[in-house]
C-alpha cells in the first residue's frame, strides 16, 4: 500500500508491505508483532527505505554487520541479542532480547555510545515525525 503525504507543498511517499506470516516475526515484542502480522510488514519512506519500520526480511541483529566502532562501545550491548527495526541515517532503533520476557529498547548510533533504556514508541513516533519534516 502506498501512502502519499503532502507537507508544505512537498510530497512524501511511504510504503506499507502486505502483512507477514514469516516465522522471523516471533522475535518481535507482541505489539510490534501484531503490526507486522495484521497491518504491514514494514512501513517506510519509499526513496531511502528508512524513516519507518523495516520489512521483517531487512531486520538484522547488530552482530550481523560491522559498525566500525571502538571495542568499548561494541561491548556495551550484547550485539547478537540486539536487532534494529528502524534506521534514520545516523542511528538505529533497536530491541535487545537478553531478557526475552522483558525486551529493552535502545538507540544504536553509528558514531557514538548507544542510548539505553528508551521508550520505543516515543522514539518511533519522533523519528517518523522528523522524516516528515525533511
Language model segments and positions:
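Membrane topogenic helices and adjacent juxtamembrane segments
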Residues: 1-5, 100-102, 108
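A surface-exposed partner-binding patch
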Residues: 1-93
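Intrinsically disordered, low-complexity regions enriched in Ser/Pro/Gly/Gln/His and often acidic
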Residues: 36, 101-102, 120
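Catalytic loop of the DD-peptidase/beta-lactamase superfamily, centered on the K-T-G motif
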Residues: 47, 98-99, 103
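A broadly tuned preference for mixed-charge, low-complexity surface segments
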Residues: 88-89, 102-106, 132-134
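Short, solvent-exposed loop/turn segments at secondary-structure junctions
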Residues: 89-93, 100-101, 112-114
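Short conserved micro-motifs at the rims of enzyme active sites and ligand-binding pockets
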Residues: 95-98, 106-107, 119
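Compact, glycine/acidic-enriched structural inserts
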Residues: 108, 112-134
Amino acid at each position: 500500500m502506498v501512502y502519499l503525504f503532502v507537507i508544505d507543498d512537498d510530497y512524501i511517499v511511504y510504503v506499507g508491505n502486505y502483512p507477514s506470516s514469516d516465522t522471523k516475526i516471533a522475535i518481535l515484542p507482541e505489539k510490534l508483532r501484531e503490526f507486522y502480522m495484521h497491518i504491514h510488514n514494514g512501513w517506510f519512506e519509499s526513496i531511502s527505505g528508512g524513516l519507518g519500520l523495516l520489512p521483517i526480511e531487512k531486520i538484522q541483529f547488530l552482530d550481523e554487520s560491522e559498525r566500525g566502532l571502538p571495542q568499548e562501545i561494541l561491548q556495551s550491548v550484547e550485539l547478537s541479542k540486539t536487532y534494529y527495526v528502524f534506521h534514520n541515517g545516523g542511528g538505529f532503533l533497536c530491541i535487545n532480547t537478553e531478557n526475552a520476557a522483558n525486551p529493552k529498547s535502545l538507540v544504536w548510533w553509528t558514531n557514538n555510545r548507544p542510548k539505553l533504556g528508551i521508550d520505543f514508541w516515543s522514539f518511533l513516533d519522533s523519528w517518523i515525525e522528523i522524516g516528515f519534516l525533511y
